[in-house]
């Protein structure tokens, strides 16, 4: 029986305006582009690192 992949749900709470281009690219990598948008992603160390990089403009909603 295969394990279900863990997921993490994030929401963009801040604007990407006047942010460094690497932070904007990170938001695109997280599938976010506007305030209030949510994205459900696999819970991997890479995704966790991306969230940590833009933690001031995103919020973790749910971890399953």
Curated annotation (Swiss-Prot):
The Gene Ontology terms for molecular function here are: structural constituent of ribosome
Q: Where is this region: Disordered?
A: 1-22
Alphabetized InterPro entries for the sequence: Ribo_uL30_ferredoxin-like_sf (IPR036919), Ribosomal_uL30_bac-type (IPR005996), Ribosomal_uL30_ferredoxin-like (IPR016082)
Checking HAMAP family in the record gives:
Ribosomal_uL30_B
Q: Which Pfam families does the protein's record reference?
A: Ribosomal_L30
> Which keywords does this chain's UniProt record carry?
Ribonucleoprotein, Ribosomal protein
Q: Which residues form a coiled coil?
A: none
Q: Which family does it belong to?
A: Belongs to the universal ribosomal protein uL30 family.
Q: Which SUPFAM superfamilies match?
A: Ribosomal protein L30p/L7e
Gene Ontology CC: large ribosomal subunit
Subunit structure of this chain's protein: Part of the 50S ribosomal subunit.
A GO BP entry is:
translation
Q: What is this protein called?
A: Large ribosomal subunit protein uL30
């Amino acid at each position: 029986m295969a394990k279900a992949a863990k997921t993490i749900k994030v929401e963009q709470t801040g604007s990407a305006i006047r942010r460094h281009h690497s932070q904007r690219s990170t938001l695109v990598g997280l599938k976010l582009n506007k305030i209030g948008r949510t994205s459900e992603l696999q819970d991997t160390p890479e995704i966790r690192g991306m969230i940590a990089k833009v933690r001031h403009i995103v919020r973790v909603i749910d971890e399953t």
